[in-house]
Amino acid sequence: MDWTWRILFLVAAATGAHSQVQLVQSGAEVKKPGASVKVSCKASGYTFTGYYMHWVRQAPGQGLEWMGWINPNSGGTNYAQKFQGWVTMTRDTSISTAYMELSRLRSDDTAVYYCAR
C-alpha cells in the first residue's frame, strides 16, 4: 500500500460523516516568513491515546503531503525526512489534544494543514 493512498484514507477517515469521531482544529492563521505556527487538533469520540495522530498538508494546487505522526500514548514521533528538525509534534493527553508546530516558515509553507487519526 503506498503512502498516497494511506494519506487520502486518513483525511477521509478524519472527516467521515457517519463517524462519532471528531477532530477539531484551530483556525486559520497568517504568519510572516521566519515565524513559527502551532496548530492544535482536539479529539473526541474515541480513546485519544489509542491511535496515532498524523499530520498532512496540502499546498494550493498540490497533492497531499504527509508530515509525520505522534503516538499520543507515549509521545513518540516519526517525522517525514523533509520535516525533521523543522516540525515538532506534541500532545496533551489531559485535554485530548495534539499539536503540530512548524518553525522558520517560508512562503511555500502556505497550505491547509490537517490532523488525521
UniProtKB/Swiss-Prot annotation:
Residues 70-77 are annotated as: Complementarity-determining-2. Residues 45-52 are annotated as: Complementarity-determining-1. Changing M89S: In IMGT allele IGHV1-2*01; requires 2 nucleotide substitutions. Keywords: Adaptive immunity, Cell membrane, Disulfide bond, Immunity, Immunoglobulin, Immunoglobulin domain, Membrane, Pyrrolidone carboxylic acid, Secreted, Signal. One of its GO terms (biological process) is immunoglobulin mediated immune response. InterPro entries: Ig-like_dom, Ig-like_dom_sf, Ig-like_fold, Ig_V-set, IgHV. Residues 1-19 form the signal peptide. Residues 20-44 are annotated as: Framework-1. SMART domains: IGv (SM00406). GO terms for molecular function: antigen binding. Residues 20-117 form the Ig-like domain. Residues 78-115 are annotated as: Framework-3. Residues 116-117 are annotated as: Complementarity-determining-3. It holds the Pfam family V-set. PROSITE patterns: IG_LIKE. GO terms for cellular component: extracellular region; immunoglobulin complex; plasma membrane. Transmembrane segments: none annotated. Its main location: secreted. The modification Pyrrolidone carboxylic acid is found at Q20. Residues 53-69 are annotated as: Framework-2. It is found in: Secreted; Cell membrane. PANTHER family: IMMUNOGLOBULIN HEAVY CHAIN. V region of the variable domain of immunoglobulin heavy chains that participates in the antigen recognition. Immunoglobulins, also known as antibodies, are membrane-bound or secreted glycoproteins produced by B lymphocytes. In the recognition phase of humoral immunity, the membrane-bound immunoglobulins serve as receptors which, upon binding of a specific antigen, trigger the clonal expansion and differentiation of B lymphocytes into immunoglobulins-secreting plasma cells. This is Immunoglobulin heavy variable 1-2. It comes from Homo sapiens.
